[in-house]
Amino acid sequence: MEQTWRWYGPNDPVSLADVRQAGATGVVTALHHIPNGEVWSVEEILKRKAIVEDAGLVWSVVESVPIHEDIKTHTGNYEQWIANYQQTLRNLAQCGIRTVCYNFMPVLDWTRTDLEYVLPDGSKALRFDQIEFAAFEMHILKRPGAEADYTEEEIAQAAERFATMSDEDKARLTRNIIAGLPGAEEGYTLDQFRKHLELYKDIDKAKLRENFAVFLKAIIPVAEEVGVRMAVHPDDPPRPILGLPRIVSTIEDMQWMVDTVNSMANGFTMCTGSYGVRADNDLVDMIKQFGPRIYFTHLRSTMREDNPKTFHEAAHLNGDVDMYEVVKAIVEEEHRRKAEGKEDLIPMRPDHGHQMLDDLKKKTNPGYSAIGRLKGLAEVRGVELAIQRAFFSH
């Protein structure tokens, strides 16, 4: 695997010098300063590429070229936004950057309720609490019909939880959910958020798939033409939330994508921390079935709690993800490619890390502190080395 590291650009508290010392050779970044939907010019791409290369690294993967909400709702200026996206892909290819991660999550990108969940060892993790989320949705956001998405027990627990929350607790929970986590391109006020949800009131899973198909049929031929590999990131968490459909959550969704546009440019980001939240997702089977189309991997683990829809981010080698079997399946896919004469390694980044040691005293991007990811990268690197030596060192 190619060892990579997500970097949020010049404002990231983790420097490129830090990234290099962590042992990564590739950088995963994006032009976050360019508004959603606008074309990334060759000039801006080359500027960022030069910064990365001057630090002795390579820009391996774009994460992400964000998709304008008009495309997802198939409204407004969606045709122009699609044309802009096509041009951005052409410009990236011209600059030699050929792997693009993206997602098709409506309104919200990845979502957590607690950004400072304290683990028994004193380090901090990200957590999604189903009851807190229900309390937000029913009692703070007051989304009409939200009760239909919860069990009677969850509704009662959410009311109880809400009753014990201080104003600061409510403000923090709201901020955590709607203000935009790292990599999310949109942050909202509560009123803006309600308005955005309203845009989806007539969009169910079938309709969102229809809109996604329009995007794929416009984008994938361009990607194929210029040699770019698109790698869709799964929904996080991988299930409908806030009454919004989610359409990249299961192996069935992956198969739908391939059936919709059967091109090798139409590929996947294997994010074990997103897919792995669902007990019915067999990660190794996903890798084996869709291995040739996996162009990027995010390796992390989560731990489901008593309510199976509640989870926290576990250490990379713990939790519900069998990291050994996952890495073995990825390495096997790389060797299969090698036997076909393809030398490309699959870029891997240690996804999220616990906030620990002196990062606890620093301002960090939630999930993206340096030391927790350094630990995760070192652990995954060790697993890969052992697998390579044990199975492939002839």
From Swiss-Prot:
Q: Does the keyword Cell membrane apply?
A: no
Q: Per UniProt, which keywords does this protein have?
A: Iron, Lyase, Manganese
What reaction(s) does this enzyme catalyze?
D-mannonate = 2-dehydro-3-deoxy-D-gluconate + H2O
InterPro entries linked: Man_deHydtase, Xyl_isomerase-like_sf
- Say if the entry is tagged with keyword Lyase: yes
GO MF annotation terms = ferrous iron binding; manganese ion binding; mannonate dehydratase activity
Tell me its EC number(s), please.
4.2.1.8
Under Pfam families, the record lists: UxuA
* Signal peptide range: none
Q: Which cofactor does it need?
A: Fe(2+); Mn(2+)
This protein's pathway reads:
Carbohydrate metabolism; pentose and glucuronate interconversion
Q: Which SUPFAM superfamilies match?
A: Xylose isomerase-like
Report the record's Gene Ontology biological process terms: D-glucuronate catabolic process
Q: What does this protein do?
A: Catalyzes the dehydration of D-mannonate.
Family membership noted in the UniProt record: Belongs to the mannonate dehydratase family.
Protein name in UniProt? Mannonate dehydratase
Query: Taxonomic lineage per UniProt?
Result: Bacteria, Pseudomonadati, Pseudomonadota, Gammaproteobacteria, Enterobacterales
